[in-house]
Amino acid sequence: MTQAPSFNPSTSILRHLVADGTDPAQYLGHHIALHGGSGIGGALQAANIPQDYRHLTPQDAPPLAAQAEAARAAKRLSERFREHFKDGYRLRSAYLHSTSPGTGKTTLACALLNEFIALNYLAKLKGLSHHRHPAYFLDVNAWQGSYNLAVALGKDSAEMQAFVAELRLAQAAHMVVLDDIGVREATPGFRTHLHTLVNARVAAGKPTIYTSNVELKELPMVFGERRLADRVGEQCVAIAFTGESKRGLR
């Protein structure tokens, strides 16, 4: 007899969404749908969640113990996610910021994205309204580097096609994390693509979770214009992170 594969339930983003005392074997198949059989696949892979963050949830993400404001905001956002799938509540965007890197912004952003993916999956199982493309993670700093390389290689290069493909994925997803926005000055060409993405999402009423090391009010100086910064701040709640770097605590 073939033995069913086992897994560590503490790594599953479903762990806080199933009834207490549920035998993990009962939701192994659902775990695989989200994480993949090897832990590298499933819905989280499709959403481009970095591997180190795929086990996180807003209930126990490491930075929250030291970030009171962020912890309260995470709880509110989790509640709103549930209302979204139950009653169609329209979600707002969130702007997670701190002056110091490594305070847990990306960690919490991914934890929230994981939660949204899990709730979307459960809504689908229950026959409730859900999203075909629920979520996507985009590292804006890396995306800008990809753009610079693509421009150097030409508009018909494979690199430019890959850059545009990420733009399309981030436009299609209902919820997106735009990580490290405003981390460095943007060229006019890249800024145009970033504005296209942000504007399309705002116009479609799709929520975005931004992370940044600059406050919203400082974005015009980083971008060299106010138009894009204003779009980022539209229908968006700012959440401040404090303290020094906590990297290594994931």
Residue ranges and their predicted role:
Residues 80-92, 123-129:
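Short helix/loop segment immediately N-terminal to the Walker
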Residues 1-83, 237-239, 243, 247-250:
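A short, basic N-terminal segment
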Residues 69-75, 99, 103, 113-172:
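Short glycine-rich substrate-engagement loop in P-loop NTPases that contacts/grips substrate
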Residues 91-95, 135, 175, 207-209:
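Residue-level preference for the first positions of well-ordered beta-strands
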Residues 87-88, 128-130, 168-171, 199-205, ...:
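Conserved catalytic network of the ASCE P-loop NTPase/AAA+ motor domain
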Residues 87-110:
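Walker A/P-loop nucleotide-binding motif
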